[in-house]
């Protein structure tokens, strides 16, 4: 008989909001009372830091900006972060995993976020960035700054999630207020952090611990996540399908993902066949050449509901490992066999193909992260 496992979680997770956009996103998370993480706000703007609800703040570049901000100049933002590398290092030390939230295109977020990531990686910390890209109406110059910032940031993070603000406009409609639109963007950032944090902080029958998260999230490249909640007899299949069809995953060829992290959250009525159903649904898109980590966690408040969270990482990277299925407990062999036998055609790679990758003429269908969409709850608001 399965018994709930008491979770001993020593992993330290820190969330760093860089610049105005990142600071707003972290402040939003603080107000939503996300558990199991420490929050920091980093900015060149002293006034913004005085007003924030984030408990721990770091002012950077006071000798350069005199506390007045970076003036929409990423070079100033970078120099400001360089000036206070020691303060950033002190804040990051002791963390096992760091989320960096920033809005790309401005001065501080664009210039300083890559420096924060660089410091984190120098400390050996698993580093994930969740950033927004500017609206098209903000101009080509700001968009160019954003693209440059994302390129630089990608050099220093393990996984990178980008959310184009224009997707908010398309999904929520032109009648949405500016405050509500940016609030929705903050919800996207919050969902990414909360979804991964809960994977390793909630106890369950099959825990996804920090080592599992590191295995998947360290597959360097672009990352996407989706989640689904359903109830009733077919709740497992419905929740899994919602997770993998979430707009965050839409328009992306997930067969190129090098890592897939799956967490099933339900009450004490979770059945073994429901675990298998989720596994069978995930296998329909998982590549042959991926690390798949599956876990379950228990939430007595879920009642009849079941939630599936899927994180796909390493998208767009060339080197891919042989498939590995990682769980904390043994899965029935038929399920294991099906994971190893099924997979979508891999992307064409400019390298020697690994075993099982024999389709050298397959068209490259993966799209750039610009095409990331908005989570299902936002799409439903527009319906």
Swiss-Prot record:
For the modification (Microbial infection) ADP-ribosylarginine, the affected residues are: 174, 338
- PTM note: (Microbial infection) ADP-ribosylated on Arg-174 and sometimes Arg-338 by Tre1 when infected by S.proteamaculans strain 568. This prevents the formation of Z rings, inhibiting cell division, leading to cell elongation and disadvantaging E.coli over S.proteamaculans during competition for nutrients. In vitro it can be de-ADP-ribosylated by S.proteamaculans Tri1.
Keyword Cytoplasm recorded: yes
Q: One biological process GO term for this chain?
A: division septum assembly
Q: Which GO terms describe its molecular function?
A: GTP binding; GTPase activity; identical protein binding
Is S-adenosyl-L-methionine one of the keywords?
no
Induction of expression = Repressed 1.3-fold by hydroxyurea (at protein level).
Q: Which GO terms describe its cellular component?
A: cell division site; cytoplasm; divisome complex; plasma membrane
Tell me the superkingdom of the source.
Bacteria
What does UniProt list under activity regulation?
A: Formation of the FtsZ ring is inhibited by SulA, MinCD, DicB and toxins CbtA and CptA. Inhibition by toxin CbtA, SulA or DicB overexpression is neutralized by cytoskeleton bundling-enhancing protein CbeA, while inhibition by toxin CptA is neutralized by antitoxin CptB. Either FtsA or ZipA is required for Z ring formation and stabilization.
- UniProt subcellular location: Cytoplasm
- What keywords tag this UniProt record? ADP-ribosylation, Cell cycle, Cell division, Cytoplasm, GTP-binding, Nucleotide-binding, Septation
> Which InterPro entries does this entry report, sorted A to Z?
Cell_div_FtsZ (IPR000158), Cell_div_FtsZ_CS (IPR020805), FtsZ/CetZ (IPR045061), FtsZ_C (IPR024757), Tub_FtsZ_C (IPR008280), Tubulin/FtsZ-like_C (IPR037103), Tubulin/FtsZ_2-layer-sand-dom (IPR018316), Tubulin/FtsZ_GTPase_sf (IPR036525)
Q: What is its main location?
A: cytoplasm
The residues that hold GTP are 20-24, 107-109, 138, 142, 186
Q: Which Pfam families match?
A: FtsZ_C, Tubulin
Q: Which family does it belong to?
A: Belongs to the FtsZ family.
What UniProt notes about the protein's domains is: The central and C-terminal regions are required for dimerization.
Q: What does this protein do?
A: Essential cell division protein that forms a contractile ring structure (Z ring) at the future cell division site. The regulation of the ring assembly controls the timing and the location of cell division. One of the functions of the FtsZ ring is to recruit other cell division proteins to the septum to produce a new cell wall between the dividing cells. Binds GTP and shows GTPase activity. Polymerization and bundle formation is enhanced by CbeA.
How is the quaternary structure described?
A: Homodimer. Polymerizes to form a dynamic ring structure in a strictly GTP-dependent manner. Polymers persist as long as GTP is present and disappear rapidly as soon as it is consumed. Interacts directly with several other division proteins, including FtsA and ZipA. Interacts with polymerization inhibitors SulA, CbtA and CptA. Interacts with MreB and polymerization bundling-enhancing factor CbeA. Interacts with CbtA, YkfI and YpjF.
Descriptive protein name: Cell division protein FtsZ
Please name the taxonomic classification of the source.
Bacteria, Pseudomonadati, Pseudomonadota, Gammaproteobacteria, Enterobacterales
